C-alpha cells in the first residue's frame, strides 16, 4: 500500500478538482493505496502520514502560473522529483513552460490512454467514478461553492475549434455519449445521501447525435422537470437542477433539442454570446428557449478578445461598444419576450456574465487586446463589483450602471473608479431611522455634486482635447507627473480626480520645490477656490492617519483655507494631524 498525496494550489475556484478525484478513486479502489488531499501546503494536524510514495499536483488556470509553480516546488520538498506528477488544464496548454520552470514534464490531456501514469489500467481513469470523499480532507478550511452536486461529463470534446478556446487541445476527440448512471450509483453508495444538483461539464452537448439518449438518462436519474430533492438535514423538499455549465451552442440549438431540454430540470440554460457577429443566431436561440418555457437563461459574454476563427466563421476583434450592445440586447430581449406573455405565465430572466479574454498561454490576468485599454478593462470590473460579475435584466439597473446609450457608457468607462462607484439613484431604506436616511440622502447629494463636476469638465472637452485626455488616462496609471503631459487647464483639473492621495501629496511637494507656474496656478485656483471637494479624498486620508512622518506638509500652502478649516473642524483633539497643524500656526 502506497501513500499518495494530491495537491491543488491554494487559488480560489468554484469546482472541486475532478481529475484529482478520479486519480484518488483509482489509487484507492484499484491499487488499494492510502490517499490524502490538500489545497495548498499540508496543514498541521490533518494527516499522520509523513512520507509519500507519489505526489500529484494539478494545474487549472494559466494565469495562476505563480501559485502553480509554488505548489510544484513545495512538492519537491516532500519527495524526489521523479515521484511528482504534474497535470491538469494549465500544464496541458503550456507543457514546455512547466517543464522548463520545474524540471518535470507534465502529463497532458485526458487520462484515457495507457501508460500515462505508469500503472496497469491507468487508461480507465478518465471514465472512473470520482472520489468525493477526498473533499473531507480539506473541509476544516476550504469549501467549494458547488459541493452538493454531481460533476459529470455526458460527452467529451467540442469540434467547433474556436481560436480563443482550450477545448480543442484538452479534448481533441468528440465522444457523443458517456453514460453517467453507474457513476452516480457508485457516488450515492459511498455517501450518506444523494447529491442535490447535477453539473454537466460537457463542452458541446448539443453536437451529440445521442442527445435524446442523454436527456432520457437524465430523466431516469431523477433530474426531470420539477424534480424534487429531500434535504437530508431539514427533511424539506427542494428543487433539483441540471446545469450544462460550459454552455449550449446557439448554432446547434433547434426546436427539437429545445423541446428535449425543456423536459429536464435545467437551470439556467447557458448560451454563449461570444461575439456581436453572432447576434442573430443568439437571439434566435433565446426565442427558441422561451417558446419551450425554458425561462431561466444566462450567457457568457466574451470581451477583450482579438480576432479569432471558429464555428466556420472569422470574427473581428471585439470593442467596448460591442460589449454594451450585447448586454443591452439581453435587457431589451427579455422585456420584449415578457411583454408578450400573459400575467399568469412565468417570465424569462437572462443573466449575463461578462468574461474577460485571457490568451491560453498567458501567465497573468493583465492581457489587453488591440481594441481595449487598461482603463476600460478596470472600469468594467468596477461596474460589476456590486453584482459580483453578473448583469441581470433589470432595465433600471442596467441603464444606471452602464449608461442610457453607448455614448454615456463610453464616458463612464473614462470616469475615475471612485466616481463610477458614486453614481446611482438614491433609495430610502425602510429599516433605518428618518435621521439616518436624511444623512444618507445628504451624502448622496454631495456625491452627485462631485460626479456632476467631473461630467461638466469632461463634456467641455473638444474632440481634440478628448483624444489628448484619453491618451493620458487609458494606461490606467495615475501619478503626479501626468498633469505635466498637458497644458490644457480642463485636462489638468480632470486629472486631479484620478490621482491617488499619495500622488496628490507628491504633487504639492513638487510645487514647493520646482518652478511650474502654469500648472501650480491652475491646480491651486481649482482646489482652493473653484471646487475644493476634489480634495475630499485627501481630507479623509489625513483624518485617518496615525503618523504624519511619512509626508511633508507642503500641501497646506496650496489647498486653501476652507480645506484647512475642515481639517481643524473634523480632526480629533488629540490626533497627530491636529498637533501638526497647530505646530505650523495655521
What kind of feature is each model-predicted range?
Residues 97-117, 258-268, 325-408:
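Structural recognition of alpha->loop->beta junctions
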Residues 8-12, 16-148:
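Glycine-rich beta-alpha loop elements in corrinoid/cobalamin-binding modules
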Residues 3-6, 28-37, 47-49, 81, ...:
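Radical SAM enzyme core and accessory elements
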Residues 6, 183-305:
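Conserved SAM/AdoMet-binding glycine-rich loop
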Residues 28, 71-80, 166, 219, ...:
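Surface-exposed amphipathic alpha-helices with a cationic face
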Residues 1-3, 32-34, 148, 161, ...:
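Residues that mark the start of a beta-strand
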Residues 18-19, 144-182:
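Canonical Radical SAM [4Fe-4S] cluster-binding loop centered on the CxxxCxxC motif
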Residues 54-56, 83-85, 198, 265-270, ...:
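Conserved C-terminal portion of the radical SAM core fold
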Amino acid at each position: 500500500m502506497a501513500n499518495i498525496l494530491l495537491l491543488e494550489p491554494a487559488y480560489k475556484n468554484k469546482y472541486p478538482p475532478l481529475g484529482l478525484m478520479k486519480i484518488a478513486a483509482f489509487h484507492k479502489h484499484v491499487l488499494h493505496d492510502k490517499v490524502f488531499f490538500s489545497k495548498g501546503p499540508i496543514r498541521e494536524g490533518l494527516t499522520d502520514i509523513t512520507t509519500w510514495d507519489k505526489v500529484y499536483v494539478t494545474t487549472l488556470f494559466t494565469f495562476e502560473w505563480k501559485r502553480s509553480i509554488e505548489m510544484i516546488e513545495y512538492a519537491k520538498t516532500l519527495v524526489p522529483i521523479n515521484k511528482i506528477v504534474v497535470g491538469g488544464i494549465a500544464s496541458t496548454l503550456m507543457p514546455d513552460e512547466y517543464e522548463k520552470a520545474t524540471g518535470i514534464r507534465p502529463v497532458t490531456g485526458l487520462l484515457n490512454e495507457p501508460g500515462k501514469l505508469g500503472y496497469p489500467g491507468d487508461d480507465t481513469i478518465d471514465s472512473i467514478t470520482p472520489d468525493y470523499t477526498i473533499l473531507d480532507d480539506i473541509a476544516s478550511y476550504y469549501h467549494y461553492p458547488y459541493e452538493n452536486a454531481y460533476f459529470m461529463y455526458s460527452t467529451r470534446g467540442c469540434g467547433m475549434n474556436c481560436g480563443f478556446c482550450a477545448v480543442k487541445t484538452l479534448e481533441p476527440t468528440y465522444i457523443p455519449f458517456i453514460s453517467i448512471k453507474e457513476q452516480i450509483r457508485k457516488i450515492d453508495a459511498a455517501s450518506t445521501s444523494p447529491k442535490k444538483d447535477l453539473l454537466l461539464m460537457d463542452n458541446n452537448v448539443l453536437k451529440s447525435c445521442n442527445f435524446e439518449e442523454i436527456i432520457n438518462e437524465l430523466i431516469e436519474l431523477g433530474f426531470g422537470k420539477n424534480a424534487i430533492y429531500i434535504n437530508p438535514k431539514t427533511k424539506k423538499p427542494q428543487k433539483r437542477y441540471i446545469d450544462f455549465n460550459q454552455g449550449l451552442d446557439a448554432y446547434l440549438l433547434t426546436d427539437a433539442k429545445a423541446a428535449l431540454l425543456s423536459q429536464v430540470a435545467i437551470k439556467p440554460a447557458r448560451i454563449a454570446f461570444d461575439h456581436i457577429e453572432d447576434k442573430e443566431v443568439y437571439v434566435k436561440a433565446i426565442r427558441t428557449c422561451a417558446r419551450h418555457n425554458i425561462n431561466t437563461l444566462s450567457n457568457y459574454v466574451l470581451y477583450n478578445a482579438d480576432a479569432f476563427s471558429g464555428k466556420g466563421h472569422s470574427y473581428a476583434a471585439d470593442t467596448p461598444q460591442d460589449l454594451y450592445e450585447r448586454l443591452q440586447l439581453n435587457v431589451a430581449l427579455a422585456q420584449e419576450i415578457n411583454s408578450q406573455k400573459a400575467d399568469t405565465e412565468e417570465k424569462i430572466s437572462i443573466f449575463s456574465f461578462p468574461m474577460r479574454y485571457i490568451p491560453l498561454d498567458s501567465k497573468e490576468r493583465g492581457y489587453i487586446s488591440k481594441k481595449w485599454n487598461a482603463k476600460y478593462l478596470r472600469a468594467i470590473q468596477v461596474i460589476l463589483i456590486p453584482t459580483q460579475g453578473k448583469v441581470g435584466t433589470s432595465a433600471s439597473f442596467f441603464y444606471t450602471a452602464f449608461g442610457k446609450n453607448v455614448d454615456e457608457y463610453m464616458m463612464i468607462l473614462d470616469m475615475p473608479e471612485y466616481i463610477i462607484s458614486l453614481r446611482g439613484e438614491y433609495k430610502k431604506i425602510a429599516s433605518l431611522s428618518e435621521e439616518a436616511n436624511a444623512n444618507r440622502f445628504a451624502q448622496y447629494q454631495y456625491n452627485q455634486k462631485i460626479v456632476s463636476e467631473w461630467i461638466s469638465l469632461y463634456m467641455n472637452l473638444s474632440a481634440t482635447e478628448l483624444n489628448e485626455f484619453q491618451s493620458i488616462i487609458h494606461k490606467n496609471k495615475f501619478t503626479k507627473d501626468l498633469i505635466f503631459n498637458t497644458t490644457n487647464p480642463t485636462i489638468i483639473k480632470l486629472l486631479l480626480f484620478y490621482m491617488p492621495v499619495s500622488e496628490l501629496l507628491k504633487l504639492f511637494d513638487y510645487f514647493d520645490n520646482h518652478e511650474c507656474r502654469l500648472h501650480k496656478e491652475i491646480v491651486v485656483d481649482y482646489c482652493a477656490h473653484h471646487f475644493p471637494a476634489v480634495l475630499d479624498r485627501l481630507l479623509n486620508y489625513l483624518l485617518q492617519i496615525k503618523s504624519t512622518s511619512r509626508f511633508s506638509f507642503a500641501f497646506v500652502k496650496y489647498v486653501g483655507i476652507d480645506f484647512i478649516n475642515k481639517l481643524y473642524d473634523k480632526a480629533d483633539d488629540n490626533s497627530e494631524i491636529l498637533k501638526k497643524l497647530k505646530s505650523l500656526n495655521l
